[in-house]
């Protein structure tokens, strides 16, 4: 829906959508045979709903000076409604496809893993509190079923989602006579439990620290016991060498900045030039984020 107000000094569009998609193409894990461990299949149902809004305002407009600003906002949610249609355990509810981390009535793209609740410390080792397969400086994870063991089928759970919660951007444009200054702020936000990623996987091999220049990673040492990541080069057999915390990738970025000048036509006519615009521009000049992985 389009709207405008104050003699079109404010205008924009608002859209809400909902849809359902059937027979999605997806690679299903299968028992490995003939070198194949996945097969593409048309399966499942997924619902989508979202909200998008664009609003433009012109706070100031005179002969020599103008200022306009545009705000964009979008939010999308999907939900898996069906996968294979199988209820193997007979509980009256369709089974999740855990091997592919697809869960009924959850968004596609879940972070299904062990839940980190802390870090094992040297004092825990001295007091005999660290279970077999772990060491100080490694992740302490939740024992979901309280059996004293850490197994993939019993102790992993949904701890978040990889898709963003929402996106927004703000673009400002200022014009004074022949000068124009524009800048855009862009942001992707995770909100609660959304837009997660795992930047700490390279810590399993200390060589990666040197090859990828990861010295700024907040990794565990005896002098840094409350670090975000475990000690370098050591991983637990229970969790595997690629396991690392899920960290929100939310950011706010000064994405585009441009300063331009339109050379007056009266000056250009002397050189038989119709139009000339001089400008300088910068991209991704500032980023505010807690994410320390690759962009």
Where are these regions (language model features)?
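Conserved small-residue
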Residues: 41, 51, 58-162
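Flexible, solvent-exposed coil segments and beta strand-coil junctions
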Residues: 28-38, 93-94, 145-153, 231-243, ...
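Outer-membrane beta-barrel and related beta-rich outer-membrane complex signature
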Residues: 24-28, 32, 75-100, 190-219, ...
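Residues that define the transmembrane beta-barrel architecture of outer-membrane proteins
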Residues: 47-51, 65, 164-168, 250-255
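Composition- and surface-driven signal marking solvent-exposed, interaction-prone regions
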Residues: 11-16, 26-30, 66-70, 84-87, ...
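Solvent-exposed loop/turn elements at secondary-structure boundaries
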Residues: 16, 26-46, 89
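Membrane-embedded beta-strands that build the outer-membrane beta-barrel scaffold
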Residues: 1-5, 10-18, 51-59, 67-75, ...
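Extracytoplasmic gating/loop element in the C-terminal half of outer-membrane beta-barrel translocons
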Residues: 188-277, 281-283
């Amino acid at each position: 829906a389009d709207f405008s107000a104050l003699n079109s000094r404010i205008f924009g569009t608002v859209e809400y959508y909902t849809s359902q998609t059937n027979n999605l193409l997806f690679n299903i894990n299968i028992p490995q045979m003939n070198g194949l461990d996945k097969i593409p299949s048309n399966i499942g149902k997924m619902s989508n709903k979202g909200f998008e809004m664009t609003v433009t305002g012109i706070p100031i407009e005179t002969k020599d000076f103008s200022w306009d600003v545009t705000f964009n906002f979008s939010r999308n949610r999907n939900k898996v409604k069906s996968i294979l249609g199988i209820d193997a355990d007979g509980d009256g509810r369709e089974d999740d496809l855990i091997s592919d981390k697809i869960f009924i009535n959850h968004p596609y793209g879940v972070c299904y893993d062990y839940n980190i609740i802390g870090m094992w410390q040297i004092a825990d080792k001295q007091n005999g509190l660290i279970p077999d397969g772990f060491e100080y400086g490694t992740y302490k994870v939740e024992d979901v079923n309280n059996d004293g063991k850490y197994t993939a089928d019993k102790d992993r759970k949904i701890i978040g989602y990889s898709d963003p919660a929402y996106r927004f951007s703000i673009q400002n444009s200022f014009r004074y006579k022949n000068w124009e200054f524009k800048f855009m702020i862009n942001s992707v936000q995770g909100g609660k439990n959304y837009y997660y990623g795992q930047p700490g996987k390279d810590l399993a091999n200390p060589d990666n620290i040197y090859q990828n220049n990861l010295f700024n990673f907040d990794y565990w040492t005896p002098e840094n016991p409350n670090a975000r990541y475990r000690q370098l080069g050591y991983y637990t057999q229970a969790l595997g060498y690629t396991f690392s915390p899920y960290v929100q990738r939310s950011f706010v970025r000064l994405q585009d900045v441009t300063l331009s000048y339109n050379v007056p036509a009266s000056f250009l006519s002397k050189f038989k030039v119709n139009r000339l615009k001089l400008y300088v521009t910068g991209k991704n000049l500032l980023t505010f984020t807690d994410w320390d992985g690759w962009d």
